[in-house]
Amino acid sequence: MTDQPNNGAVANEENGPQFSLQRIYVRDLSFEAPKSPAIFRQEWTPTVSLDLNTRQKQLEGDFYEVVLTLSVTVNNGDEVAFIVEVQQAGIFLIKGLDDGAMSHTLGAFCPNILFPYAREAIDNLVVRGSFPALMLAPVNFDALYAQELQRMQEAGETPTVQ
């Protein structure tokens, strides 16, 4: 036994894959209730439409920004009750991954981390707008990523980070 630290183990940790969440923040947020206050006097029979999008951007070095955009439109009958949109973003330190793992991390793993924050922001806005709570169902980002990857392969495209 020696009192000297194992420098080889430290070197391996520094050179191996690394993932670290640096910051989560709201990049953009909006809420519109175009038919209020009249909409509050109507029978509530909502239909919900959800649009979801992600984008990634390499910042300096091994830092990446991932932005998850959720747009929710709720109609009551033929009228728009409300529209809410949130861009939930995160900055991640990611290094030591091959291209496939990096693409999956940015396209599925990071959005999965951001989704609960976006869902909570949307629910809070809806309730503050005096509408019933809107708890969005979980999203399978791995399946969405696999579908997008298949679509890109069929189109002859390759995933890129801007």
Curated annotation (Swiss-Prot):
Disulfide bonds: none annotated. One of its GO terms (cellular component) is cytoplasm. Its main location: cytoplasm. It is found in: Cytoplasm. GO terms for biological process: protein folding; protein tetramerization; protein transport. One of its GO terms (molecular function) is unfolded protein binding. Pfam families: SecB. The keyword Lyase does not apply. Belongs to the SecB family. One of the proteins required for the normal export of preproteins out of the cell cytoplasm. It is a molecular chaperone that binds to a subset of precursor proteins, maintaining them in a translocation-competent state. It also specifically binds to its receptor SecA. Homotetramer, a dimer of dimers. One homotetramer interacts with 1 SecA dimer. This is Protein-export protein SecB. The gene is secB.
